[in-house]
């Protein structure tokens, strides 16, 4: 971490000496490219290697710093078999008066995080995980909290004006295919010493949820989602990808009925309030985001719960936890029928200049993120005696379930999940107010949410 921060500081100093203090920002025209290598490591997925590319079309420059259209492409590979492919497009000119944002994403994850439902009601044994990493004689326990998932996303979003430059309608179609199940132990154990391999006779949490009936037979394995999204948006941001002031408020419903091809139908909604408060204009900004995602009715398939639903140039992301939602918290730590999360951060653009005919800036960020389960997913033991080959196996499974549940928070009408909070800081490289490379570190306040995480990614969260 220290080496990374020192290297980043050296880059800032060197480019500041080369560059000129910015007086009049260069208005960009035509096509601008933003390539970036994607390199990371995960103990269960292995090394990540890949690349991403942002393409911005500013046309004649009339709308700069907001582009007429933009492409985002990414391909990443992990040494133990996981892959990520992303292709999204966002244009304001293809359809007159309508913003069109299609995208296709394929994620093949051999070791996806799975910590159960309802936040702290699902106990995370961080001591056992640490023992598996630090004790040479103990097997790695982290695969216990993993599942395998292949996820295909195809979407097409449309946005049009109701009141010029302020109020908009939103509509979209989404198609998702989920294939989810237990991990492939051979792939997860690949390259590990025999004593560190996750044993075949130890069930993962996902496998236990199946045995206890928390994840039903109908939902096990995944399914198809086909549905519409309908919503409204109020947007007064001065710059879309790097705002200094304004409001950005959205509310939309997700409708995935059976007759449209959805395997396990559901209906959900998402409300998001974002506010950008200029303290020193174009230098220091207080930005915060409040989100509430709920389920209409009392049920939704477990595999749709982790996602933060979005319109526009991006696509639905795993949450809550991770770079796009709650930085520093383990990915998918908070899943429930209804969840809420917040982000609050100070953004200080401490230097800006022009270099090689590009507008360059560096920004420091201090932040706090958090999430909470508001309405719980049903975690009751649903199996019957007839589901087991003997009463002894039934009793053993029931006792195992009771022991597991006794370690977490017990839900009742007045006692919901506690806040999962993190704090952290980051540095961003900003080119032409659109291509943004972020270096951030987040630390949870509770070890039940992990030990913290360092991210190298693109853009602002919001």
Region locations from a protein language model:
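Gram-negative/organellar outer-membrane beta-barrel architecture
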Residues: 25-33, 41-224, 320-324, 448-462
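Hydrophobic, lipid-facing positions within transmembrane beta-strands of outer-membrane proteins
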Residues: 33-35, 49-51, 83-87, 150-156, ...
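Surface-exposed extracellular loop regions of Gram-negative outer-membrane beta-barrel proteins
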Residues: 51-73, 229-272, 424-430, 435-440
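Outer-membrane beta-barrel translocator domains and adjoining extracellular loop/strand segments
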Residues: 65-66, 84-87, 112-120, 181-188, ...
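C-terminal outer-membrane beta-barrel translocator/porin domains of Gram-negative envelope proteins
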Residues: 228, 239-356, 376, 395-396
